[in-house]
Amino acid sequence: MENLARRLDLCQEQLLELYEQNSKELQQHILHWKYIRYESAIYYTARQMGIKHLGHQVVPSLDVSKAKAHAAIEMQMCLESLQNTEYNVEPWTLQDTSQELWLAEPKKCFKKGGKTVEVRFDCNETNAMHYTLWTTVYVQVDDAWTKVKGQVDYKGLSYTVHGCTTYYVDFAKEAQTYGKTNRWTVIVGSHVICSPSTIEEHGLPIVETADARPPTTATDTPDAPATATTETVGPAQAPPRKRRRNGHLPITTTVGKSLGGEYVDTADRTRTPDPESNNGHRNCGGGSSTPIIQLEGEANCLKCFRYRLGKVSHLFCNSSTTWRWTTESRTEKNAIITLTYSSVQQRSDFLAIVKIPKTIKHSLGMLTLM
């Protein structure tokens, strides 16, 4: 027992050192999963011997240790095969090589640079869902890794390998769950992908995401056919967010020409963009804006969920206590928790990895301090 406890301490010390180093080298993340495998093997052996505590730590059940060891072996082997490619010189974070991201759609692929895509079902702004479009996807085909760009079109989110396109989010299936009319509008950055009738008339444009190119600006091309248009979204472009004020971001439809400083919504109304907005971010002079997610639900459910978020504390900056509105006219009993983020990108990564329970409603917003 003492021998197992000593080995467990050494293994966990190595894990803590790796967490503190916060390395961006792929080899270090291979070591991370190797030590997790060792840790699970020690727990498994201890449980087989009838030991339920090693030091101050509770020994998990055999099934839990076995499942965790299998997951660690899978991650270690995949990272070792990736290490033997030209992609080993790229920066890789602990989050990039996490099991949560590995199992997020598209599953069993490494991915980087998540961007938020808003889909308005029934073309209704109040009936919108957000999905993650990955800038870069690393796909393993026949024991070889291929680096491809994520794509979005009216059908869904996809990537293409050797001419074969794989959709990992199908908007038609999503519309069966969230919509009623089997119609939807896709918004990515400042681009809008329109209704099926428009797509059938003009063809199906694709918006690609670039992995290392600077963002490009769409220009008016009235003489060019819409089917020849391919828009590129640069990695520095902020993911879209729902605007609650009168101002709107300039939007460019993929089947038409850029409208410059105006935005045309699904009801063909023309609005002028907010003069304070700049590429999706508000420029407040002396103030600053912080991306937030507001969680609303039953108080105990929120507290339990906040406790579980401690395991992924690297995905957000701060969490508030539970609070409520005190307006006398409100009879709402639900409590609220506010999470803050260092950037819109971090918030997108949070939504891509963390599964929010159905009993908890969440809203995206910006907290501005003047």
Swiss-Prot record:
DNA-binding found in the keyword field: yes
GO molecular function: DNA binding; DNA-binding transcription factor activity; nucleotide binding
Transmembrane segments: none
Gene3D superfamilies associated with the record: 3.30.70.330, E2 (early) protein, N terminal domain, subdomain 1, Papillomavirus E2 early protein domain
Gene Ontology cellular-component terms listed: host cell nucleus
Highest taxon listed in the record's lineage: Viruses
Region (Disordered): 212-255, 268-287
Region called DNA-binding domain, residue ranges: 289-370
Record has Phosphoprotein as a keyword: yes
Region (Transactivation domain): 1-200
Keywords for the protein's UniProt record, in alphabetical order: Activator, DNA replication, DNA-binding, Early protein, Host nucleus, Phosphoprotein, Repressor, Transcription, Transcription regulation
Main location: host cell
Post-translational modification: Phosphorylated.
Low complexity bias (residue ranges): 212-230
Pfam families, sorted: PPV_E2_C (PF00511), PPV_E2_N (PF00508)
GO BP annotation list: DNA replication; DNA-templated transcription; regulation of DNA replication; viral DNA genome replication
Family, similarity comment: Belongs to the papillomaviridae E2 protein family.
Record note on quaternary structure: Binds DNA as homodimer. Interacts with protein E1; this interaction greatly increases E1 DNA-binding activity. Interacts with protein L1; this interaction enhances E2-dependent replication and transcription activation. Interacts with protein L2; this interaction inhibits E2 transcriptional activity but not DNA replication function E2. Interacts with protein E7; this interaction inhibits E7 oncogenic activity. Interacts with host TAF1; this interaction modulates E2-dependent transcriptional regulation. Interacts with host BRD4; this interaction mediates E2 transcriptional activation function.
Protein name: Regulatory protein E2
Organism: Human papillomavirus 40
Gene: E2
